[in-house]
Regions:
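TRNA-recognition modules of translation machinery and tRNA-sensing kinases, especially anticodon-binding
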Residues: 1-177
Length: 178
């Protein structure tokens, strides 16, 4: 029997691996120069995290998650995106209320029909800037937003990307401590 990589999940070898490494090193150098800290999260999280953050009625949660039950009958999912795990890590490590700028880079997984430009395993880079909006001035919030935008535009320039769409989301998290 001959083994192959799973459908929609490709190996990176040779020149392709070198190209990915070059792009990643340029991105990492830039985000570090802006003062962002790296966050590495597990590939798997409890499914409830994605249901709550992405939405339990979304296609990502209902159709595209790679999920399984562990030996304790807990539903576990392989990450389909990075934000949920990063925010969970910052909250769990008590870094969410201090104002922090972080970046992440890594493989994400979605069970969808592979097609041009869309695979089941893909690399995602993201920056997250957490700040206490109640304790921060409007000026601080604008400065934080401009820092994120400036960093992302510099990445686009360094990578010589001509045709791009920049999407920015502002999520206000409300929660109480136990």
């Amino acid at each position: 029997m001959k083994y192959k990589s799973l459908r929609g999940m490709n190996d990176l070898v040779g020149d392709q691996a070198k190209k990915y490494s070059l792009v990643e090193s340029k991105i990492i150098s830039l985000v570090n120069s802006y003062g962002f800290d790296e966050v590495r999260t597990p590939l798997a999280e409890v499914t409830e995290l994605f249901e709550r953050s992405i939405g339990s009625s979304t296609d990502i949660v209902n159709k595209e998650l790679y999920s399984f039950e562990d030996r304790n009958n807990k539903s576990i999912s392989i990450r389909p995106e990075g934000t949920a795990g990063v925010v969970r890590a910052l909250i769990e490590n008590d870094l969410d209320r201090h104002g922090i700028d972080v970046w992440y880079l890594g493989p994400m997984y979605r069970y969808e029909r592979p097609q041009k430009g869309r695979l089941r395993q893909f690399q995602q880079f993201g920056v997250e800037s957490l700040i206490d909006q109640e304790k921060s001035s409007q000026e601080e919030l604008i400065r934080m937003e401009l820092k994120v935008i400036g960093c992302l535009l510099d990445i686009v320039e360094v990578l010589n990307i001509k045709d791009f769409k920049l999407e920015i989301n502002n999520i206000c998290l409300l929660y109480t401590s136990d």
